[in-house]
From Swiss-Prot:
Homodimer. This is Acetate kinase 1. Coiled coil: none annotated. Mg(2+) binds at N9, E384. The keyword Translocase does not apply.
Length: 398
């Protein structure tokens, strides 16, 4: 008997959705509503072929979910009839949620309480949850938290060197994100390396418009690059990642930037976009490397930052690193970035197999280092939707 779960991932201006069989892993439907709240709001989906439609000017999450229910699922009533539960990706669960949770009023309030830590994401998740409850009143909803996987980090990894009362009273600490993806990759890597998951040591690089690195020791997160919020760490599409905090005071006190302008700049105008002054698209950076100064500059900074994190995280693994893994839109598809990063890690005895690396794109996976490389590097496609579906099935007993 199938265990079909509707998986929802609400961003500030998007809604990613899928219908996943939690038992077989088969994806029966997938799609994305994007540009929500804007005149060009639209929805794309795969169900018996590829489809696209306009949602109407200014359409929001409610309208997108209504379209999914009344148009997409209505076109395949036998699929809609088999839905058993709904799983939601939630970016921030703070310290309150160390694992996925069946959503009730208390859980919903907890997600709302964490909104200040993920202001671009948690409010959108709440909208999605309430819209799903309205659209499917008979189905149970489960929240799967990005931060939960990282709750195994030791104190020395998650504490900031700030007055300790800021942690005790206000919960200011490193939380990390992309936990669902890091968990899936750890599981997959263990299987491919033929090791028990609880004995696996890897460093996983989840690289997309948002990006993070995670040190995984004996199958558990022991350090990760994102912090209190998704702004810390690597160079990202539009986010700055690590900077000297005093830059903020300089921008405010000396250059006269408002706090709002600084916040917008660091989250939406920095990263690859800031370095190129043209685009946040990694494909532009990759295609024009060595030809255009702005692309070369951005790619060099991106790869330097990533290699530095990977090298540093070896210190958290007690001298044993079983593999370096790449996932996410950039991690799975950018052979040049993977090669540049791994070449910077040659001190660890890593040698890239250029042919294998080129093959591991656009759905290709596998080992991308030579047989004599001391540490293997692998490309593994992430599947956060499956993890969310599995947790939802487990908590709802479907």
């Amino acid at each position: 008997m199938s265990k079909l779960v509707l998986v929802l991932n609400c961003g500030s201006s998007s809604l990613k959705f899928a219908v996943v069989d939690a038992q077989s892993g088969e994806q029966h439907l997938s799609g994305l509503a994007e540009c929500l709240h804007l005149p060009e709001a639209r929805i794309k989906w795969k169900l018996d072929g590829k489809h696209e439609a306009q949602l109407g000017e200014g359409a929001a999450h409610d309208e997108a979910l209504s379209f999914i229910v009344e148009t997409i699922l209505a076109s395949k009533p036998e699929l809609a009839a088999q839905l058993k539960a709904i799983g939601h990706r939630v970016v921030h669960g703070g310290e309150q949620f160390t694992q996925s949770a069946l959503i009730d009023d208390a859980v919903l309030k907890g997600i709302e309480d964490c909104a200040a830590l993920a202001p671009l994401h948690n409010p959108a998740h709440i909208i999605g949850i309430k819209a799903a409850q309205k659209a499917f009143p008979e189905l149970k909803n489960v929240a799967v938290f990005d931060t939960a996987f990282h709750q195994t980090m030791p104190e020395e990894a998650y504490l900031y060197a700030l007055p300790y009362n800021l942690y005790k009273e206000h919960g200011i600490r490193r939380y990390g994100m992309h936990g669902t993806s890091h968990l899936f990759i750890a599981r997959e890597a263990a299987e491919r390396l033929g090791k028990p998951a609880n004995e696996l040591n890897i460093i996983n690089c989840h690289l997309g418009n948002g990006a993070s690195v995670c040190a995984i020791k004996n199958g558990q997160s022991v350090d990760t690059s994102m912090g209190l919020t998704p702004l810390e760490g690597l160079v990202m599409g539009t986010r700055c990642g690590d900077i000297d905090p005093a830059i903020i005071f300089h921008l405010h006190d000396t250059l006269g930037y408002s706090v709002e302008k600084i916040n917008t700049m660091l989250t939406k105008e920095s990263g690859l976009l800031g370095l190129t002054e043209v685009t946040s698209d990694c494909r532009f950076v990759e295609d024009n490397y060595g030809q255009k100064e702005e692309a070369t500059r951005a790619m060099d900074v991106f790869c330097h930052r990533l290699a530095k994190y990977v090298a540093g995280y070896t210190a958290s693994l007690d001298g044993r690193l079983d593999a370096i893994t790449f996932t996410g839109g950039i991690g799975e598809n950018s052979a040049p970035i993977r090669e540049m990063v791994l070449n910077r890690l040659a001190i660890f005895g890593i040698t890239v197999d250029s042919a294998a690396n080129l093959k591991a794109r656009f759905g290709g996976e596998g080992v991308i280092t030579t047989a004599d490389s001391r540490i293997p590097a692998m490309v593994i496609a992430t599947n956060e939707e499956l993890v969310i579906a599995e947790d939802t099935a487990r908590l709802t007993n479907i």
